[in-house]
């Protein structure tokens, strides 16, 4: 028979664990971990080229980083997105205003708009591309020397592997908890608590690795000064999951340890 205090601790711990799992799962699947807010470009730009380069172009960290900086990009663990004007030809100019130039980034920039009506802010559309698994494991290089950047490489790999480890541990602890209920044993609860404790550390490590990786990315490719950095709500969800998992771990560990002491005392009393 289980004391009401232990049962209450198990129920509360299970609810906290479920909330943490939902928050972390949503955070992993969304792209709003980090955002860049840039002012509206007042030049004529071929947005079709930018869209094709971002969506179907060759994977290059420097290229997609420049797009994130310029076009109000958002970055997640598995997604990168930009916001471009919703038009198929030229942005902020008419066909007669074009003056084609050869730019290194394959964009065609023209002189500032000279329309009598001025440049109205166009409607924008969000374009998102997911990171493939080989891209996640790709080696990061230093921009100037083209040497492997070990720090950024392993930070990037940890930032998407750690949440998967965290979710796997929570799922495994759920299986252990079900087995404990079927066996009517309180001992596996200690293992459940340890799994949640490690999962909480992995969740915190995810946030730290991601934030450090983004900081190094901005420094490596010299983010423009007019691009404002904003922390997205997805990162906050992942950060909230850390204390929830820790509280769940504390409840499970307390329940397992207290029940063991209580059971030992009852056994000793009966023997005496």
Regions found by a protein language model. Name each.
Residues 1-69, 93, 98-103, 107, ...:
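Intrinsically disordered terminal tails
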Residues 2-36, 156-213, 241, 245-255:
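Signature of small four-pass
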Residues 34-157:
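A surface-exposed beta-alpha-beta supersecondary segment
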Residues 82, 163, 238:
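Residues in well-ordered beta-strands of folded domains
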Residues 141, 145, 171-174, 260:
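N-proximal short alpha-helices
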Residues 203-236:
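Juxtamembrane loop segments immediately following a transmembrane helix
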């Amino acid at each position: 028979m289980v004391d009401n205090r232990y049962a209450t601790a198990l129920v509360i711990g299970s609810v906290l664990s479920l909330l943490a799992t939902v928050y972390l799962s949503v955070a992993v699947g969304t792209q709003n971990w980090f955002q860049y807010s840039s002012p509206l470009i007042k030049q004529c730009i071929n947005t079709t080229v930018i869209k094709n380069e971002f969506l179907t172009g060759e994977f290059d960290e420097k290229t997609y980083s420049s797009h994130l900086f310029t076009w109000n990009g958002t970055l997640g663990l598995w997604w990168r997105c930009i916001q471009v004007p919703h038009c198929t030809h030229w942005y902020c100019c008419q066909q007669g205003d074009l003056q084609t130039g050869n730019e290194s980034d394959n964009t065609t920039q023209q002189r500032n708009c000279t329309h009598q009506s001025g440049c109205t802010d166009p409607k924008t559309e969000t374009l998102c591309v997911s990171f493939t698994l080989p891209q996640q494991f790709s080696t990061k290089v230093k921009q100037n020397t083209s040497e492997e950047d070990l720090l950024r490489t392993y930070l990037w790999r940890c930032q998407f592997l750690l949440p998967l480890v965290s979710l796997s541990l929570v799922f495994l602890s759920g299986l252990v908890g079900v087995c404990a209920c079927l066996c009517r044993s309180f001992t596996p609860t200690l293992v459940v608590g340890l799994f949640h404790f490690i999962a909480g550390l992995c969740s915190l490590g995810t946030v730290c690795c991601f934030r450090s990786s983004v900081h190094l990315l901005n420094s490596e490719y010299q983010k423009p000064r007019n691009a404002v950095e904003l922390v997205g709500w997805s990162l906050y969800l992942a950060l909230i999951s850390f204390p929830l998992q820790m509280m769940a771990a504390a409840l499970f560990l307390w329940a397992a340890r207290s029940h063991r002491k209580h059971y030992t005392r009852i056994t000793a009393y009966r023997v005496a």
